[in-house]
Every structure is written in C-alpha cells, then in structure tokens.
Swiss-Prot record:
Pathway membership: One-carbon metabolism; methanogenesis from CO(2); methyl-coenzyme M from 5,10-methylene-5,6,7,8-tetrahydromethanopterin: step 2/2
Subcellular location as annotated: Cell membrane
UniProt entry keywords in alphabetical sequence: Cell membrane, Membrane, Methanogenesis, Methyltransferase, One-carbon metabolism, Transferase, Translocase, Transmembrane, Transmembrane helix
Pfam families listed in its UniProt record: MtrB (PF05440)
EC number(s) on file: 7.2.1.4
InterPro entries the UniProt entry points to: MtrB_MeTrfase (IPR008690)
GO molecular function term, any single one: tetrahydromethanopterin S-methyltransferase activity
Protein name: Tetrahydromethanopterin S-methyltransferase subunit B
Primary location recorded for the protein, binned into one broad class: membrane
HAMAP family in alphabetical order: MtrB
One annotated GO biological process: methylation
Family: Belongs to the MtrB family.
Length: 103
C-alpha cells in the first residue's frame, strides 16, 4: 500500500513516499528540482555526524586543524583535574572549619 503525503491542500500536490515522486493530485506528474534540498541534507548530515563524533573523544572536531585527534579526551582530563582541585579544596576548608584549625 502506497503512503502519500499531502503537500498543499489548495493545489493538490501529493508526495509518494515509496517512490519519492511528487504528483499533482493523483494524476499528472510534477517535476521538481530537489538538488538544493539534497545539498542542504548533505550539510545537515555532516553536522549531525560531527555532533555524534563530539560525544566520542577519539574523533577530532569538525572544523579543527590537522592532527587534533583526542582533543576531547585531553579536555576531559583537564576538566576533571580542575573541578577535582576546587572540590577537594572546598572539602578541606570545611574540615578545617569544623575541626577548628587555626591558621
């Protein structure tokens, strides 16, 4: 069974999902240039791939210099060290206040 998508109700345009053909109503064929849409879809696919790869630290960012593999992993180490330092310092300060250590 064919699946149809109505594009416009005023002008009876129908898109057939299985064949990818846009027809006028259910009769004559209407030819449409879809190459600009395909170019935009390709750009969107590259951005989606870059977004998916940003979740994996083994891949470089989309617009980066060559040999930048592992930049996300390195930034993960620095972020962990940064927050670990400040959280540890805060815990030590709380313990010093609770124990009544005089400076």
């Amino acid at each position: 069974m064919a699946t149809y998508v109505f594009i416009d109700q005023n002008i009876p345009l129908v898109y057939t999902v299985e064949t990818g053909v846009i027809t006028k109503g259910f009769g004559d064929l209407l030819f449409v240039d879809v190459s600009p849409i395909e170019e935009q879809i390709k750009k969107l696919e590259t951005l989606v791939d870059a977004y998916e790869h940003s979740l994996d630290p083994r891949y470089p960012p989309l617009n980066s210099f060559p040999n930048r593999d592992g930049v996300y992993a390195i930034s993960g180490y620095f972020k962990s060290a940064f927050f670990g330092f400040w959280i540890g310092l805060g815990i030590m300060a709380l313990l010093a206040i609770i124990l009544g250590v005089k400076f």
